[in-house]
Design a protein with these regions (language model features):
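Positively charged n-region of N-terminal signal peptides that target proteins for export
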Residues: 1-5
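Bacterial N-terminal signal peptides
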Residues: 6-17
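N-terminal secretory/targeting leader peptides
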Residues: 22-114, 122-326
């Protein structure tokens, strides 16, 4: 019996409608900051952009405030593919590629403009490239401002740091920096820092304006010292296991979303940093603005020593030489 063209067409359409649709990819994004921190705003923005640019083919579920783990755990979770994305400090990546701890060196960048200029160079890209062989892809650099001390006693000179226990990230460079300044660097998980300050496990810590305000560290410390001793980038990292599952079109969309997040975060950070400095002035006993020269002098030898240990002497020389242009 001969089928009519209409019947054939109807049959074909019915058959095609039964073909399984390609499953949506769902990936988790793990952040460590509270919901009202600029990092959290930018993470939410990234998720929205990925959904938009992939037309819903990829859904990013965003978790904040260490819900899925702290920064150290997030690095490993990205590597093994348990989570797809995270925002981590470059310092946190030293556990995978030790050279990334170069970013923790004190007074490495002359100012914000110098910092962002370097991140756009081939030298910065070369520093990050080995991470891919370790299961991590960098999609963008995220602003995290300059780092300053918040303590129980006023820090006006390096001498004031002698004997002080200062919380740092799990970074050998940061521990050695505190030693050069006369203090003891004590690695403490971010989620545990408030209690550590409250109970005297540490005498102080260091971080940027928005992070100090978001976690209300002014409730458990009295003085904030604007020494700007470090400027360490946060990074948007992605699991290479997830990356390798994507089509070329999807890879481009996710990479574009990462660059959009980088730009968005710079704007959000500027707004938050200005606002939060006023909050710090209102809540700390005193905002100390020290002469930076003694701090720079105290750590000058450390920069070269750590550069040699990390195998990044040429990169450090490149950065230090470029300071004159800023």
């Amino acid at each position: 019996m001969r089928m009519t063209a209409a019947v054939v067409t109807a049959f074909s359409c019915a058959f095609l409608s039964l073909a399984p649709a390609k499953a949506q990819i769902v990936a988790k994004y793990s952040g460590i900051q509270p919901i009202d921190h600029p990092s959290s705003y930018s993470e939410k923005y990234f998720g929205e952009e990925v959904g938009l640019l992939t037309k819903g083919a990829i859904k990013v579920e965003v978790y904040h405030n260490t819900q899925l783990g702290d920064a150290v755990a997030n690095v490993q979770s990205v590597r093994n593919g348990t989570i797809g994305f995270s925002t981590v400090s470059a310092s946190n990546l030293n556990q995978v590629v030790p050279a990334m701890d170069m970013y923790s060196l004190p007074f490495l960048f002359k100012n914000e403009a110098h910092f962002w200029w370097f991140l756009s160079t081939p030298e910065a890209a070369a520093l990050a490239k080995p991470l891919e062989d370790k299961g991590i892809k960098i999609l963008g650099y995220l602003d995290s401002g300059s780092r300053n001390f918040f303590t129980q006693k006023a820090i006006r000179t390096p001498d004031d740091l002698k004997g002080q226990k200062i919380r740092v990230m799990a970074s050998p460079v940061m521990v050695n920096t505190m030693k050069a300044l006369g203090a003891t660097g004590v690695p403490v998980a971010w989620a545990e820092l408030y209690t550590a300050l409250q109970t005297g496990v540490v005498d102080g810590a260091e971080n940027n304006h928005p992070s100090v305000v978001a976690k209300k560290f002014y409730e458990v410390s009295k003085f904030y010292t604007l020494d700007e001793h470090m400027r360490i980038p946060d990074m948007l990292i992605m699991s290479m296991k997830l990356w390798n599952q994507l089509s070329d079109e999807q890879k481009k969309a996710v990479a574009d979303a990462g660059q959009r997040m980088q730009a968005y975060m710079r704007g959000a950070w500027k707004i938050s940093e200005t606002k939060d400095l006023q909050a710090l002035k209102s809540n700390f006993t005193e905002i100390v603005t020290p002469d930076k020269a003694p701090f720079v002098k105290a750590v000058s030898g450390l920069v070269q020593e750590e550069g040699k240990r990390l195998g990044v002497e040429k990169t450090i020389a490149f950065i230090l030489d470029s300071q004159k242009n800023f």
